[in-house]
Amino acid sequence: MEQSSNRPEDFPLNVFSVTPYTPSTADIQVSDDDKAGATLLFSGIFLGLVGITFTVMGWIKYQGVSHFEWTQLLGPILLSVGVTFILISVCKFKMLSCQLCTDNEERVLDSDQTSGGQSFVFTGINQPITFHGATVVQYIPPPYGSQEPLGMNTTYLQPMMNPCGLVPSSGAVAATPSPPQYYTIYPQDNAAFVESEGFSPFVGAGHDRPSSDADQLEGTQMGEEERVCFSPPPYEEIYALPR
């Protein structure tokens, strides 16, 4: 029965760039300023036409009919009000603008939208992720062969020993995959392997000056105690071999 491992190579990751959509003039919603400007423009045109009509009627019909005298005063007033509305709508709300100004504004708008950056879409995963105007950094994972297992380190941790070479009963010896060699724990230059090092002061002192039998016996006992204290424990006591 084959075991399938979910590795990153099994899921291809596709990255492609998406150009941001530039809304056209028709897609932009009409604002309140545009509505007010359009109202003033058409009102000014209408009042201007009415003012011109009244002015012409007053100057033409004034000689024959006296009822058109008021048109000489009302016509110029309506004409001036209509021209004022038209100027306000053109200057303040920019209802009537030249083609060159319109092209310049569209170029500025396009440059502002382009400076925001492109959109990147990541597919090949559970849910596609889209980044708008973000900086994409490519991440190359390390090879799997160089990763060490999360378990115990391969280096051996030596247990804590007391001066007599005994393992403390309170702490347990760390389990290792393979126990170390005996000479790595107790090298040959240890004081326990050198026979003359434990009691050499006492032997040298006996040759230099005469001493009594009690001093020699005491020195011999101390040498034996030190030898027992510094003697290494058996290998089977430290690391029990698996059975």
From Swiss-Prot:
Residues 205-229 are annotated as: Disordered. It is found in: Endoplasmic reticulum membrane; Apical cell membrane. Pfam families: TMEM174. GO terms for cellular component: apical plasma membrane; endoplasmic reticulum membrane. The keyword Cytoplasm does not apply. It comes from the Eukaryota. InterPro entries: TMEM174. Keywords: Cell membrane, Endoplasmic reticulum, Membrane, Transmembrane, Transmembrane helix. Its main location: endoplasmic reticulum. It is a multi-pass membrane protein. One of its GO terms (biological process) is phosphate ion homeostasis. The chain crosses the membrane at residues 40-60, 73-93. PANTHER family: TRANSMEMBRANE PROTEIN 174. Interacts with SLC34A1; regulates SLC34A1 internalization by PTH and FGF23. Regulator of plasma phosphate homeostasis. Decreases serum inorganic phosphate (Pi) uptake by regulating the sodium-phosphate cotransporter SLC34A1 trafficking by PTH and FGF23 in the kidney. This is Transmembrane protein 174.
